[in-house]
Design a protein with these regions (language model features):
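N-terminal active-site beta-alpha-beta segment that forms phosphate/nucleotide-binding
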Residues: 1-102
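Conserved phosphate- and dinucleotide-binding cores of soluble alpha/beta proteins
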Residues: 67-177
Length: 177
């Protein structure tokens, strides 16, 4: 675990954490594994760490949330899943869907689509999930910067007790949603 040091946004993750994470994955991933990938700057920095994977692994990297948008595409789950797959010389399955829906009815209809059901069915088979913990503070919030949410929503989450998020799922000090 690394707390965010007071350096620039692009330097917030140490090179050692990135290479250590990749070395760990290199050691534990095996053929047939399903690897879920979320979003964000930490995962971006990990996948771009200076580390060469020893052997190709026939696993599949799957975004665990959608990610279509106009800003910071390199931090979206689809792009990160693809980059992890490239790094490990593996496969990835894209999930071209919004990360958030403004209308619950649209979301319910979307979940009925065969291609979406296929991706959702893989979530139950995940062996590993790569995620980072976001903070609901404007200066550090990647999801705010990506325009998934606005400052008012972020402030509302904080006022309701949110201390962090994992894959856009906010939680309080006790880990409860």
């Amino acid at each position: 675990v690394e707390d965010r040091p007071s350096r620039s946004e692009s330097e917030h993750i140490s090179p050692l954490l990135g290479t250590t994470t990749l070395a760990y994955l290199d050691r534990i991933l095996k053929d047939g594994d399903m690897v879920g990938v979320t979003l964000g700057l930490t995962l971006y920095n990990i996948v771009h760490a200076d580390y060469t994977v020893d052997k190709a692994v026939q696993c599949c990297f799957v975004p665990v949330l959608g990610g279509v948008g106009e800003t910071y595409a390199e931090l979206h789950a689809n792009r990160l899943a693809e980059e992890f797959a490239r790094k490990f010389r593996s496969d990835f399955l894209p999930f071209y869907a919004p990360a958030l829906f403004s209308d619950a009815g649209v979301l319910q209809g979307f979940k009925k689509e065969p291609s979406v059901r296929k991706v959702f069915s893989l979530f139950e088979r995940l062996d590993v999930v790569l995620f980072s913990i976001g903070v609901p503070q404007g200066d550090y919030s990647t999801v705010l910067r990506m325009k998934y949410i606005d400052e008012k929503i972020l402030k509302d989450f904080s006022e309701q007790g949110a201390v962090g998020d994992i894959g856009l799922q906010y939680f309080d000090i006790n880990g409860s949603p």
